[in-house]
């Protein structure tokens, strides 16, 4: 583990919003007196009706989380209208297309008109407050307009990543009973079309079989590619917005009215609908965006995530726009036309703050320094990373080569469930250690506990819990509050359990060590092993499957599958390829297995439980100490798995 320390540099400290002294003072107040602290900082957004209650939360019993509950506000108003008087002509969104020669800029005045028109189209077709709208879009400005239009009229959006399959999309439509979908004829990624409208049509058929009927589909024209069309149901976005007014009053929303549902992987098969509400979420997204990235007026800020993930919600759309920032939306991929794309975009748009995932950093590091050094990158002031822990080697390369040793690397740990950054350095206050997410943000009380629930003090290695609520916290699992309590609050009573392992060093810095449950982190995206297993088992030749993660040089974690076939069938390379295709179709490319090992049997206890610990060790090519195997029903299975492992170290 790297123990190198990079102190805050003079230039960074000189312009920083928060220095060490202020961090310590604010942090102490935020945990000692959260009502006073958040009562003050809740005022960073505009309220139609000011709140008088700040925090009303309980992590025990029925678990209830409420912030600013008697206040009324509107997220779309805070992200657009309140900026118009003084900053209407400022650029809100810079859009950089998949094709490097195509881009556009959208000012706050233009954003207002686009969002109001889309909101009026939704209203015209019967969408009202509380209705769920599914958004299945590529990274184009209309995706942000759709989110903000829903927020404007009080509809609850559920954004589904454009890389997910029709089956995955259908499952999310069914779970929240969404009857209105916003999509696009086709997306573009790396020069290749993505059939979003065709996928949507397939998903709607699947949903209908489960008695959820989508009544309208609003289709944005992106490529002009051929798609199916259902008259009466399907609507062209460009035709619809021409028929409505360019203004739409924002609906007064209670702070605890739902804002969005975002599905995330759980350790059981069915994805969970993480529910975020209006007031607390926006306060937290905006505040973390400002202080973690040390955002100053006039900065150009670029987060490379997709709006289909929480990072896109909090740090492309809501946080930046609430702060009247200029946020860059990128439709493309890091290696198209070549591996220099990120650095060219930074030069082209004079980007000051750049936020990306360790997977992208590792892959670009592998492409060599020349792609980076042929660009100037002189506009860069701060680098951020998100999605998974960054290994010290990649951190050093990012700092030394991309940032020319002058930009702090802000390694942010947080989750879909947390709404915003939880453990992160503040650039002007915290010395950096490569590989460490460093220290908690204001109001966050981390605690390490062992497997028995004993609280660990000082330098320790354990399970990461948070002991008190913060405004950005998810409120429930949509439609299943018991699952919310069970998943997050039952393992360690009265504490929010993150599902991550963590080490705290002697300086009090936190190092995230990865998931401790059956959830994989592949390229910064969460995937439940159970989801991949059920996709494999749905293939007619597969009798049983077990999926584990293993260290992958680029993705962080790769997907290793043990597959037992139906009697009488042989495992072949053709079948292997077929299974990869099958999983891609069921879930999406993100879930494609890296290694498939055909196994006559899996290591099970006498009660029939699969011993995943053993499977993990074998997948990691580290089976010298498998631990206690005395409860195995058939120990010979293990020898066969070891002999046929797919991940043997090359001599």
Curated annotation (Swiss-Prot):
Its EC number is 6.2.1.1. Acetylated. Deacetylation by the SIR2-homolog deacetylase activates the enzyme. It holds the Pfam family AMP-binding_C. The modification N6-acetyllysine is found at residue 609. Mg(2+) binds at residues 537, 539, 542. Gene3D superfamilies: 3.30.300.30, N-terminal domain of ligase-like. CoA binds at residues 189-192, 311, 335, 523, 584. InterPro entries: Ac_CoA_lig (IPR011904), ACAS_N (IPR032387), AMP-bd_C (IPR025110), AMP-bd_C_sf (IPR045851), AMP-binding_CS (IPR020845), AMP-dep_synth/lig_dom (IPR000873), ANL_N_sf (IPR042099). One of its GO terms (biological process) is acetyl-CoA biosynthetic process from acetate. GO terms for cellular component: cytosol. Its cofactor is Mg(2+). It catalyses: acetate + ATP + CoA = acetyl-CoA + AMP + diphosphate. ATP binds at residues 387-389, 411-416, 500, 515, 526. Disulfide bonds: none annotated. Keywords: Acetylation, ATP-binding, Ligase, Magnesium, Metal-binding, Nucleotide-binding. Belongs to the ATP-dependent AMP-binding enzyme family. HAMAP family: Ac_CoA_synth. This is Acetyl-coenzyme A synthetase. It comes from Rhizobium leguminosarum bv. trifolii (strain WSM2304).
